[in-house]
Amino acid sequence: MSKSRSRNARPAQLMTLIGSFFALSGLLGTLVAGIMIPAVGSVGVVAKTVPTVFDGLPSEIQVIAPAEESLLLDADGGVIARFYDKRRIVVPSDKIADVMKQAIVAIEDKRFYDHHGVDPEGMARALVNNLSDGGKQGASTITQQFVRNSIQERGYLEGDAELAYSAVEQTTQRKLREVKYALTLEKSMTKDEILTGYLNIAPFGPITYGVEAASQLYFSHSAAELNWLESALLAGLVQSPVDYNPLTNPEAAETRRNTVLMVMRNEGIITEEDYQNGVNTPVADMLKPNETPQGCLGASGINAYFCDFAISQFLDDPAFGDSYAKRERLLKTGGLTIRTTLNPRLNNAAYQALVDAIPVHDESGLDTAMVTVEPGTGKVLAMAQNTEYGVEDGRTMSNYSANGIFQVGSTFKVFTLLQWLKEGNSAYASVGRNNRIYVNGEFSCGGEPIYTDTYDVEDLPGKNGTFNTISATGLSVNQAFINMASRVDFCQIFQLASDFGVTDANGEIVQALPANILGSASSSPLTMANAFAAIAHDGQLCTPQALTVVTDRSEAVIKEYTPQCKEVISPTVARQASNILGKSTARYYNATRLDGGRPFGAKSGTTNNNANTWLTGFTPQYATSAWVGRAAASQQPVQDIVINGNYYDAIYGETFVGRNIWAPYMSTVHEGLDFIGLPDVFIGNVPTPPRPAPTPNQPSNTPQSGR
């Protein structure tokens, strides 16, 4: 619309406008039949040169797919997050309300369906009006605007700032090129294709492009659902998306909307009654904004940490570009659909179990995280923690499940158990001793004694003497596991842990020290869950997988992910370990039970001063690791503490994490699943209890009572 000004044009402006008027007249006379304004005097020279300049321009514009947001989806197809630099969702013509098309044509180019890309009448009127009142009235058709926006978009996508600027520079050359491109484009595209392309590429806000994204931003519904009043508001934005932004400048937006409504009434698109109702409706009453941030910050608190993990895998994958920068640009412009392994039912249950035990911002200051991996595939099905994702005070972007490094405590003992079984030892062999002091030479690697400092095993009262491996595992007897470690290849325990993915903070094999047998080493819940998933699936360790398939904007597959697994322990040993872990939990984990008596294998872990507590375990369907501690102060004692309103003198892996987090969660997620037992495999001959010596009051055939 023309913005009239009271002042007159200065002489220099007047001459420029006169020259432009005659130059344009000559151009149109050459190009458009029926329009001819003679050129006289020196201006005629300009007019005669126009066709020559025009003929030297490229005849076709390369219309490319514009930047479009990418979607990260869960396993059920729900949107986890959107990624973009420009918020745009490209939609076909039939997904845009007809009244929206009518509104944009009415206000931007009412002769759109009559001209061939350039509107001579509109250009002449604009020149005359500008000449008469010193203002500046545009004369670009929708086709010309589409050309201009397309060139800008191509420059943006190709990182060519000069090309992007060339689309808007105030030169005759640019205008000539735009006109020729528009005329050519009208020969290769239908009016509906041009209009749809324009509505998908035009700006509707500071970073919002295309009518679909605009409709979702301002009204929280699709462009197909736009009504006439909403269409008028959006149609008015394209002239100046920042100045007329209804979220920041509602008064200006309302004035502009009313102008569009007037034109729509004059064109017969709406009635007089509609017009009166429309202009009397405050813009604020129309808006239902959806200003969800892009990226994982826009994901819900439940899914944000998995989002962080999944996008990290995407950005590390060279299938999407040979540099991090290219992969990130593809993510934010390529209109990708990234499908993931996240099971929303499991993830919701994980979050609920965590916050039921330790609420967000609990007075204890404790953090907790849990992750579930599918045995046999490595698919990460759930990843949650009791914190809010973000950069504000009280929030964190640190992913404790994937990136947290916390001492694992007795959970590490499972690798001693595996090495014990790998070397052919029986589950019923006697392990442990009363003397808890181990001196130099009692541990060996490759058959050769190794040097270690004298080590005095600390243990809870009542854990002296000998046990079999089932009871030693269930009761988590430190001295028994140190004894087992002294009777196998000591270094291979740590090599085996590394094979399962459990290393030190630098990715190196954990140092072969007696203290590390008991869990001084650190790891993440994801790594521990994945290691136990390998035990649950015949010793097959799979790479943790967050992505399943990535497709481009046309749904062509860029990459489909398949399980990447390798054998790290023999199936026999894995089954034996599963059997022992199942027997030990069934016998000794009285606080941790699954509904219906469903069998599971697990190992708890508690570090010095109860600073970190764990329960990591599995069924044939799911492997889950849960951790409790303080992420920012992982050595700080967790004793004499109130958690969720309840006092604890100390907490432990089995009685706190297992009872309050792991078991409730695993019971919930197994509802409706098949009841599958753990492997029934030979783990050694059950020793015959020695017959006690008969006494006068005890028959010789009385059996010895078990524990």
How should these model regions be labeled?
Residues 106-119, 132-138, 185-191, 203-208, ...:
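Bacterial peptidoglycan biogenesis and beta-lactam-recognition machinery
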Residues 1-71:
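N-terminal type II signal-anchor transmembrane helix
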Residues 98, 117-133, 144, 276-299, ...:
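Acidic helix-start/capping segments at beta-turn-to-alpha-helix junctions
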Residues 178, 182, 186, 238-256, ...:
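Active-site loop and adjoining helix of the penicillin-binding protein/serine DD-peptidase-beta-lactamase fold
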Residues 66-271, 327, 388, 474-478, ...:
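Peptidoglycan glycan-strand catalytic modules in the bacterial/periplasmic cell-wall system
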Residues 41-42, 59-69, 74, 137-145, ...:
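Extracytoplasmic/periplasmic proteins that interact with beta-lactams or build/remodel peptidoglycan
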Residues 336, 340-362, 370-372, 383-385, ...:
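A penicillin-recognizing enzyme superfamily signal
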Residues 132-156, 291-300, 425-493, 553-583:
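Conserved catalytic neighborhood of penicillin-recognizing serine enzymes
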